UniProtKB/Swiss-Prot annotation:
<dbReference type="GO" id="GO:0005524">
    <property type="term" value="F:ATP binding"/>
</dbReference>
<dbReference type="InterPro" id="IPR012719">
    <property type="entry name" value="Chap_CCT_gamma"/>
</dbReference>
<dbReference type="GO" id="GO:0006457">
    <property type="term" value="P:protein folding"/>
</dbReference>
<dbReference type="Pfam" id="PF00118">
    <property type="entry name" value="Cpn60_TCP1"/>
</dbReference>
<dbReference type="InterPro" id="IPR054827">
    <property type="entry name" value="thermosome_alpha"/>
</dbReference>
<dbReference type="GO" id="GO:0140662">
    <property type="term" value="F:ATP-dependent protein folding chaperone"/>
</dbReference>
<comment type="function">
    <text>Molecular chaperone; assists the folding of proteins upon ATP hydrolysis. Known to play a role, in vitro, in the folding of actin and tubulin.</text>
</comment>
<dbReference type="InterPro" id="IPR053374">
    <property type="entry name" value="TCP-1_chaperonin"/>
</dbReference>
<comment type="similarity">
    <text>Belongs to the TCP-1 chaperonin family.</text>
</comment>
<comment type="subunit">
    <text>Heterooligomeric complex of about 850 to 900 kDa that forms two stacked rings, 12 to 16 nm in diameter.</text>
</comment>
<keyword id="KW-0067">ATP-binding</keyword>
<dbReference type="GO" id="GO:0016887">
    <property type="term" value="F:ATP hydrolysis activity"/>
</dbReference>
<keyword id="KW-0143">Chaperone</keyword>
<dbReference type="InterPro" id="IPR027413">
    <property type="entry name" value="GROEL-like_equatorial_sf"/>
</dbReference>
<dbReference type="InterPro" id="IPR027409">
    <property type="entry name" value="GroEL-like_apical_dom_sf"/>
</dbReference>
<dbReference type="GO" id="GO:0005856">
    <property type="term" value="C:cytoskeleton"/>
</dbReference>
<dbReference type="InterPro" id="IPR017998">
    <property type="entry name" value="Chaperone_TCP-1"/>
</dbReference>
Length: 530
C-alpha cells in the first residue's frame, strides 16, 4: 500500500547537518592554508601547473586560487570570494580568504556546544558594524596633490609582490595611468575605468626598466598599403565601424549573367560604390582613417592618391580608446560624416618596429582620457607576473583617488580592532558575548601570519603587540608587525598604509561569507549525468 516516495535522486550524495558543517570547516581551512604563506613582504611563491600545461609562478592570492581545482562547494565559494574581492577593489584577495577562514573556525567551538547558528551570526553582524565604525575612526585622510605621499602608499601596498625591486617604477606607472583616465564629473562624481581605458601591452624583450605609460593609444597594427605615410604630426582622424569594400548580400545572392556587358556592369557598380564611400571620407580631408571592418584594394588606392593613411580591422575597444584620446566620433555610415566627427586631439601618429612586429603609436594628446601601459621584460612569465602586480598597483591607486583615506598596515588595524572589540564584548550580555569575543580574537590572524611568514617568534611578538595596544589604544593603534624583520614597529613612521576602501571591503566580505557558511545545514550533490 504505502510505497516509499523518493524526493531526491537516489544516486545523489547527501550530507546531514553535522557532516555538512564539519565538511565546510575543513574545506575552508584547507583553502586558507594554501595561501597563508602568500601574505606579507616575505611571502612565498607558489608554482602551479595549469590545465594547459603552463607553469605559473606567483604569490598573488587570486591568481593562485583561480588556477587550483577544488570539488567541495565551500572551497569553491572561498575561491569565488577571492575573485569578487579582486573585481571589486582589486586588492586584499589573500587577506579576505584567511580572515573568512579564521572567523568561520572561531565559530566551530560554539557549533559543537550546540549553540544555534542564529546567535553566532547575530553576534558576528554586531561585531562587523562596530568594526566598520572603528575603522572609520582610525582612518587618516591623504592629500591627492601630494604625489610623493600617494606614491609611498601605493608602494607600501605592492611591496609584498614579486617585483618589489621595481616597485617605484610600477607605482609611478600606475599613478600616471590612473590620473590620465580619471574623469571628474561636474556633479562631483569621479570615474576611473582602468579595465576599458588603461590598456596593458606586453612585448617580450628589453628590460623591466623600459616599461612606460603612453599618454595615448598603441596598437599592434601596420598600415594597409606600403606607400601610406608612417608618421603624421597633428593628424585629422576619422573613426569608422563600417566596411570600406563592396557590400555583399546578407544571404546567398544569385546573379544571372548572360553576356560580357552584364559582367562589366557588375564590376563597374562595385567600383562606383567603393569610390563613392571613399569620396565621402576624402572630402573632409582627413590624414588618418581607422575602421573596424575590412578595406578593399581599390579603397586603399584612392586613399594613397590623396595621401591618407588607413588602418583596418581594429577591435571595438581600440576604436573606443582612440575616440577618447582624439575627440573623434565613431561613425557607422560614411555619408553621415561631418566636420565635427573629425578627431584633432592627437599630436603624433607613428609606426614603429619593436622586435619583429610593427606597432602604431598615437601620442602627445592634448587631453588623453585613455592610455596604454607598455611592459617590457625578458620572458613571457616575467611579463605576466609584472602585469599581475601592475594591476594591483592600478587598483590601489584607483582606490586612493576615489576614497583618499588610509588605515595603518602591517596588521596594526586588525590588532586595534581586536583590542577594541574585546573590550566592547564585556558589555554584551547573553549568548552573543562569546561569539563576539571569538571574532575579535580571530582578527589577530593577520599580524600572526605576518610574523610567521618572516620567521619571527609568533607567541612572543603577539603578546608584546597585544600589550602595546592595550596600554594606550588611542595612540598605539598604528603599531603593527614589520613583515621584513619580524619586529613591532609604528606603521606611521615606517610608512606602511592600507587603503580604507580595501580594508572595509575585506571585513564586510570575510564576515558576511562566514555568516553565509554558518547557515548551511545540508549539502546535496546531484549525481553527474553520464
Amino acid at each position: 500500500m504505502n510505497q516509499p516516495v523518493f524526493v531526491l535522486n537516489t544516486n545523489a550524495k547527501r550530507e546531514n547537518q553535522k557532516e555538512a558543517q564539519q565538511g565546510i570547516f575543513l574545506a575552508v581551512k584547507s583553502v586558507a592554508s594554501i595561501i597563508k604563506t602568500c601574505l606579507g613582504p616575505k611571502a612565498m611563491l607558489k608554482m602551479i601547473l595549469d590545465p594547459m600545461g603552463t607553469t605559473v609562478v606567483t604569490n598573488d592570492g587570486n591568481a593562485i586560487l583561480r588556477e587550483i581545482d577544488v570539488t567541495h562547494p565551500a572551497a569553491k565559494s572561498m575561491i569565488e570570494l577571492s575573485r569578487a574581492q579582486d573585481e571589486n577593489v582589486g586588492d586584499g584577495t589573500t587577506s579576505v580568504v584567511i580572515l573568512a577562514a579564521e572567523v568561520l573556525a572561531s565559530s566551530e567551538l560554539f557549533i559543537e556546544k550546540k549553540i544555534h547558528p542564529h546567535y553566532i551570526i547575530k553576534a558576528f553582524r554586531m561585531a562587523l558594524d562596530d568594526s566598520l565604525s572603528i575603522v572609520d575612526q582610525y582612518s587618516v585622510a591623504i592629500d591627492l596633490k601630494n604625489r610623493p605621499e600617494v606614491l609611498k602608499v601605493v608602494q607600501s601596498c605592492i611591496g609584498t609582490k614579486f617585483i618589489g625591486k621595481w616597485g617605484s617604477l610600477m607605482c609611478n606607472l600606475a599613478l600616471d595611468a590612473v590620473m590620465t583616465v580619471h574623469i571628474q564629473e561636474e556633479d562631483g562624481r569621479s570615474e576611473i575605468d582602468i579595465k576599458r581605458y588603461a590598456k596593458v601591452e606586453k612585448i617580450p624583450g628589453g628590460d623591466i626598466s623600459d616599461c612606460r605609460v603612453i599618454r595615448g593609444v598603441m596598437l599592434n597594427k601596420d598600415v594597409t598599403h606600403p606607400k601610406m605615410k608612417r608618421m603624421i604630426k597633428n593628424p585629422r582622424i576619422v573613426l569608422l565601424d563600417c566596411s570600406l569594400e563592396y557590400k555583399k548580400g546578407e544571404s546567398d545572392t544569385m546573379v544571372d549573367i548572360t553576356n560580357e556587358d552584364d559582367f562589366s556592369a557588375l564590376l563597374k557598380i562595385e567600383e562606383e560604390y567603393v569610390q563613392r564611400i571613399c569620396e565621402d571620407i576624402i572630402k573632409l580631408k582627413p590624414d588618418l582613417v581607422f575602421t573596424e571592418k575590412g578595406v578593399s584594394d581599390l579603397a586603399q588606392h584612392f586613399f594613397v592618391k590623396k595621401g591618407i593613411t588607413c588602418l583596418r580591422r581594429l577591435k571595438k575597444s581600440e576604436n573606443n580608446r582612440i575616440a577618447r584620446i582624439s575627440g573623434a566620433t565613431i561613425v557607422s555610415r560614411t555619408d553621415e560624416l561631418q566636420e565635427s566627427d573629425i578627431g584633432t586631439g592627437c599630436g603624433l601618429f607613428e609606426i614603429r618596429k619593436i622586435g619583429d612586429e610593427y606597432f602604431t603609436f598615437l601620442e602627445d594628446c592634448k587631453e588623453p582620457k585613455a592610455c596604454t601601459i607598455l611592459l617590457r621584460g625578458a620572458s613571457k612569465d616575467i611579463l605576466n607576473e609584472v602585469e599581475r602586480n601592475l594591476t594591483d598597483a592600478l587598483n590601489v591607486a584607483r582606490n586612493i583617488v576615489l576614497d583618499p583615506r588610509l588605515v595603518p598596515g602591517g596588521g596594526a588595524i586588525e590588532m586595534a580592532l581586536s583590542q577594541a572589540l574585546s573590550e566592547k564584548s564585556k558589555s554584551i550580555e547573553g549568548l552573543h558575548q562569546l561569539p563576539y569575543k571569538a571574532l575579535a580574537q580571530s582578527l589577530e590572524c593577520i599580524p600572526k601570519i605576518l610574523a610567521q611568514n618572516c620567521g619571527a617568534n609568533t607567541v612572543k611578538l603577539l603578546t608584546e603587540l597585544r600589550a602595546k595596544h592595550a596600554t594606550n589604544p588611542t595612540e598605539n593603534y598604528t603599531y603593527g608587525v614589520d613583515g621584513d624583520n619580524g619586529t613591532i614597529v609604528d606603521m606611521k613612521q615606517l610608512g606602511i598604509w592600507d587603503t580604507h576602501s580595501v580594508k572595509v571591503q575585506t571585513l564586510k566580505t570575510a564576515i558576511e561569507s562566514a555568516c553565509t557558511m554558518l547557515r548551511v545545514d545540508h549539502i546535496a550533490s546531484a549525481a553527474s549525468k553520464q
